[in-house]
């Protein structure tokens, strides 16, 4: 199979040969959903914190005597039953949100994503993607000429000028093949891959 070559003027040129084992697979929506959710879960820092009845700042004085008032008995105002009291099962920073995805499933999911991008025409090959200086305007003008606004660039080796120029653009990311993750691949509208990076992707996912 072939991936379309995108030129600097935004025109689509001749095709570039690509492995159907990586870019020609059927789309497995359930598997893609699983690896994307697992990636997001593993990125969570676990910084949620709520207080239980021991941690809220309340007096330990008994609100009223045990019997004779006609009201329900109460021991402390920090009770979870009271407004402002502690939580019964509070969220804790020690919670573990990680989800395990084995290598075979991850590679199959990534192949499925790359194949779907190829079918939708959202992935293109470029001869090489560089800028002369680490200037955001140079890269922004280049994307404007190509008719692109939301782009993930996968390069065989990270170019410092390209990386620095892309950092101030909100919808642009530059990564190497090993750094490409399922969430970024499905998030960006267009994925640009250098010719050498195509071979690296095929080697990683074979």
Curated annotation (Swiss-Prot):
Part of the 50S ribosomal subunit. This is Large ribosomal subunit protein uL4. Keywords: Ribonucleoprotein, Ribosomal protein, RNA-binding, rRNA-binding. Residues 43-78 are annotated as: Disordered. Belongs to the universal ribosomal protein uL4 family. GO terms for cellular component: ribonucleoprotein complex; ribosome. InterPro entries: Ribosomal_uL4, Ribosomal_uL4-like, Ribosomal_uL4_dom_sf. One of the primary rRNA binding proteins, this protein initially binds near the 5'-end of the 23S rRNA. It is important during the early stages of 50S assembly. It makes multiple contacts with different domains of the 23S rRNA in the assembled 50S subunit and ribosome. The keyword rRNA-binding applies. It comes from Cupriavidus taiwanensis (strain DSM 17343 / BCRC 17206 / CCUG 44338 / CIP 107171 / LMG 19424 / R1) (Ralstonia taiwanensis (strain LMG 19424)). It comes from the Bacteria. Coiled coil: none annotated. Pfam families: Ribosomal_L4. GO terms for biological process: translation. Residues 49-58 have a biased composition (Basic and acidic residues). GO terms for molecular function: rRNA binding; structural constituent of ribosome. Gene3D superfamilies: 3.40.1370.10.
């Amino acid at each position: 199979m072939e991936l379309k070559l995108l030129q600097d003027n935004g025109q689509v040129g001749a095709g570039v040969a690509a492995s159907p084992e990586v870019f020609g697979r059927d789309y497995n929506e359930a598997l893609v959903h699983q690896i994307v959710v697992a990636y997001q879960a593993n990125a969570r820092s676990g910084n949620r914190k709520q207080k239980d009845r021991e941690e809220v700042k309340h007096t330990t004085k008994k609100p009223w005597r045990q019997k004779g008032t006609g009201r329900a008995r109460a021991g402390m105002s920090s009770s979870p039953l009271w407004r402002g009291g502690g939580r019964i099962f509070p969220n804790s920073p020690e919670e573990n949100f990680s989800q395990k995805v084995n290598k075979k499933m991850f590679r199959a999911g990534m192949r499925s994503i790359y194949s779907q991008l190829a079918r939708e025409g959202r992935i293109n090959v470029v001869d090489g993607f560089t800028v002369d200086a680490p200037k955001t305007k140079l890269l922004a003008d280049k994307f404007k000429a190509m008719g692109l606004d939301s782009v993930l660039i996968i390069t065989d080796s990270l170019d410092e000028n390209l990386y620095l120029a892309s950092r101030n653009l909100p919808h642009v990311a530059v990564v190497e093949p090993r750094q490409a993750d399922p969430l970024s691949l499905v998030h960006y509208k267009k994925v640009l891959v250098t010719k050498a990076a195509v071979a690296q992707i095929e080697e990683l996912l074979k």
